[in-house]
Design a protein with these regions (language model features):
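Short, low-complexity N-terminal intrinsically disordered segments enriched in polar/charged residues
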Residues: 1-38, 42-46
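A beta-strand edge to alpha-helix "cap/lid" segment located at domain peripheries
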Residues: 2-13, 79-153
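A structural signal for alpha-helical segments
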Residues: 16, 20, 61-64, 121
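Residue-level detector of alpha-helix boundaries and kinks
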Residues: 16-17, 29, 54, 81, ...
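A generic "alpha-helical surface" signal
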Residues: 23-27, 67, 124
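K/E-rich alpha-helical interaction surfaces of small helical-bundle regulatory domains
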Residues: 33-49, 134-138, 143, 148
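A solvent-exposed, acidic/Ser-Thr-rich amphipathic alpha-helical stretch
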Residues: 41-109
């Protein structure tokens, strides 16, 4: 796997500048979260590098690699189906910073909403999500994700 890591913001953002880069990162997250919420395990895992690390407090240890990411999505789907709920993730207050090595460092709030069949939605969790994004073949991929929950802080 070859990962592109330009050193300058101009190389990352292109002629349109940081605003265009920011919009592309928002679009990446919108796509990634919709894959996750629709339980498209393979599609979601493909938005991560092959050797990605995914750390969330609901798991005993970080997930490493795409096969583990696929298994995590399938496990979440079973839990939601058994519980009769649909979960939706909303990403906001996104901060994007560039590293000297061309890696994007992002930090945002992730709100998880749960909706029971036939019931009202409720806010299930408030989290902070911190990622390292790298480019591979012109597309952004998550290399590392750490999620923390406000209720466990």
């Amino acid at each position: 796997m070859t990962t592109e890591t330009p050193d300058r913001i101009e190389d990352l953002a292109g002629p349109s500048g940081f605003g265009d880069l920011y919009a592309r990162v928002q679009r990446f997250y919108a796509h990634q979260m919709q894959l996750f919420d629709s339980h498209d395990a393979d599609g979601w895992a493909a938005t991560f590098t092959e050797d990605a690390v995914f750390s969330v407090p609901t798991l005993d240890e970080p997930v490493r690699g795409r096969p583990g990411l696929v298994a995590n999505v399938l496990r979440n789907r079973r839990r939601q189906e058994d519980g009769g709920e649909q979960h939706r993730h909303w990403i906001g207050m996104l901060d994007v910073r560039t590293g000297a090595d061309g890696v994007l460092h992002t930090r945002c709030y992730a709100l998880v909403h749960a909706t029971p069949r036939g019931g009202d939605s409720r806010l299930l969790r408030v989290c902070v999500m911190e990622d390292e994004l790298v480019r591979d073949g012109g597309e952004w991929q998550t290399r590392r994700r750490v999620v923390t929950r406000d209720d466990l802080a």
